[in-house]
From Swiss-Prot:
Keywords: Chaperone, Cytoplasm, Nickel insertion. It comes from Polynucleobacter asymbioticus (strain DSM 18221 / CIP 109841 / QLW-P1DMWA-1). This is Urease accessory protein UreF. The keyword Lyase does not apply. Belongs to the UreF family. The lineage of its organism: Bacteria, Pseudomonadati, Pseudomonadota, Betaproteobacteria, Burkholderiales. GO terms for molecular function: nickel cation binding.
Length: 230
């Protein structure tokens, strides 16, 4: 089987924690779950991350990422704008929305600095506010990364960031973090498959119903002591 090394290294670049888009400063409600006592050790951290990954990310953010990628591939700029707006509207708290806007803006700066695209990059720059989902799907398309592989990289970055937040906020040891990362990483193919099915059905199958996550994210806005911005 032929392996495209350019695609693999591009995937590594997009998924690398060294990519300067600020993901390390966010926990997406995990820190509030720790503060409330829901997450308190390695097993509860793993359960939390797994539940959010399969119950929220796979049902909403992942299919929207695929739809955005397909829109870029078709040069359907109107659909890209609509999907970006849809995703931003699905961010249920100010912290979650600010997070994706800041990271989307940062990835846009990288794309501009590295010359990732011509006319399409101009179209990306015109989207304001710009979500990370839209910017990342664009970068994957421009770098000739297959859709499912780009989504896998996007998902791995999300998982890795959640594990890193657990290490800092609970705290956990490095080995415990790698154990959790390994177990949840193995769920990526299942997540991609579900996301593909939902994306094929359009927005009617996109579902981000997660009241506990929204409540915890709201509480985090006024949490007395915290390490993360979300």
């Amino acid at each position: 089987m032929s392996i495209d090394l350019n695609e693999i290294t591009a995937l590594m670049q997009l998924a690398s924690p060294a990519l300067p888009i600020g993901g390390y400063s966010y926990s997406q409600g995990l820190e509030a779950a720790i503060d409330s006592g829901i997450v308190k050790d390695a097993s509860t951290a793993e359960a939390w991350i797994k539940d959010v990954f399969l119950g929220v990310f796979a049902r909403s953010e992942a299919p929207l990422w695929l739809l955005s990628y397909k829109a870029w591939a078709k040069n359907d700029v109107d659909s890209v704008h609509n999907l970006n707006d849809y995703f931003l509207a699905s961010r249920e708290t100010s912290e979650l929305r600010s997070e994706t806007e800041q990271m989307g803006w940062s990835l846009l700066q990288i794309a501009q600095s590295l010359g990732w695209g011509g006319e399409c990059l101009t179209q990306l720059s015109a989207i304001k506010p710009l979500s990370l989902l839209t910017a990342h799907s664009y970068a994957s398309f421009y770098l000739n990364i297959q859709a499912k592989n780009g989504l896998a990289a996007y998902a791995f970055s999300w998982i890795e960031n959640q594990v890193a937040a657990s290490l800092k906020a609970i705290p956990l040891g490095q080995v415990a973090g790698q154990q959790a990362l390994t177990k949840i990483r193995l769920l990526v193919p299942e997540m991609v498959h579900e996301a593909e099915q939902r994306a094929n059905s359009g927005l009617s199958m996109v579902d981000n119903f997660s009241p506990m996550l929204a409540i915890l994210s709201s509480r985090h806005e006024t949490q007395y002591s915290r390490l993360f911005r979300s």
